[in-house]
């Protein structure tokens, strides 16, 4: 849908065009003074996520090996320009959770530019622990889509949402503050681990207008930004190391410091 006409119905030309566009994004990022960009991994294996008959042995492994072969030279191109890629963990792409991200990173040779664009909305709709995800992968997160969602299963539908319209789905995206995502917990976790990059409003709500979502969303994000303390609250009561005092406190006064 995005490719120019001369690439349509020609997979090889379309892929070459796409690689060129992604590489140009690295050059543009460098010229703009940006060190972070975002992308998707692409989908080779996702059509076989839940197959019947069962998929043949080696299918998933080969899909990820091919993803690695395609992405390694692109990631090298980004690294040469001082730019990293935050891959959005997103259903429909081959990388849609922590396990598949690990498979992808392994396929790239643990490339240090293959990072994560963290979007909790997709984790909530999969019923993942999106706070524990930060504990596991905080050192790989270089971008953050601040996007809300809610999941309200019932007797008729669950995670797959029964092909219903967005308004009628059990899982749906919401404007910031209207869903179920614990943003206070997320901003606290990211601050705890020293995150210092983007917090970008993403709006895809089926209930509230984009204009209202943007007007409310920007101050919502601002209200969640955390300024880390410059010192611990009880530092005033501490002091320099005093071996004699330590020995006395531990009842070791007869021992030489």
State each model region's role:
Residues 2-115, 235, 250-255:
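Active-site acidic/histidine proton-transfer and metal-coordination neighborhood
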Residues 20-36, 72, 129-142, 184-192:
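Short amphipathic alpha-helices and their capping/turn segments at secondary-structure boundaries
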Residues 37, 144, 198-199:
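Hydrophobic residues within beta-strands of alpha/beta enzymes
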Residues 42, 149, 203-204:
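Flexible loop residues that form catalytic
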Residues 62-64, 68-180, 229-233, 242:
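Acidic/histidine-rich catalytic cores of soluble enzymes
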Residues 200-210, 238:
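A short, acidic, flexible beta-alpha connecting loop/helix-capping segment that sits on the rim
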Residues 210-230:
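C-terminal helical cap(s) of enzyme catalytic domains, especially alpha/beta-barrels
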Residues 226-257:
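Terminal-tail/helix-coil boundary detector
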């Amino acid at each position: 849908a995005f490719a120019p006409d001369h690439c349509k119905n020609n997979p090889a030309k379309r892929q070459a065009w796409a690689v060129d566009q992604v590489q140009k994004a690295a050059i543009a990022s460098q010229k703009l003074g940006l060190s972070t960009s975002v992308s998707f991994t692409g989908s080779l294996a996702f059509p076989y996520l839940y197959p019947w008959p069962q998929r043949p042995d080696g299918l998933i492994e080969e899909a990820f090996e091919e993803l690695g072969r395609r992405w390694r030279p692109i990631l090298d191109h980004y690294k040469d320009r001082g730019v990293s890629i935050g891959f959005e963990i997103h259903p429909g792409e081959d990388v849609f959770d922590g396990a598949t991200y690990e498979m992808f990173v392994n396929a790239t040779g643990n490339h240090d530019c293959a990072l994560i664009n963290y979007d909790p909305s997709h984790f909530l709709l999969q019923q993942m622990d999106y706070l524990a995800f930060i504990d596991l992968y905080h050192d790989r997160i270089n971008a953050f889509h601040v996007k809300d969602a809610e999941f309200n299963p019932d007797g008729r539908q669950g995670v797959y949402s029964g092909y219903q319209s967005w308004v009628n789905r059990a899982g749906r995206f919401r404007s910031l503050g209207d869903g179920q995502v614990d943003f206070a917990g997320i901003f606290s976790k990211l601050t705890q681990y020293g995150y210092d990059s983007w917090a970008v409003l993403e709006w895809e709500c089926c209930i509230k207008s984009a204009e209202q979502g943007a007007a409310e969303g920007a101050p919502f994000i601002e209200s969640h930004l955390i300024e880390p303390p410059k010192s611990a609250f009880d530092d005033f009561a501490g002091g320099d190391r005093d071996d004699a005092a330590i020995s006395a406190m531990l009842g070791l006064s007869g021992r030489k410091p």
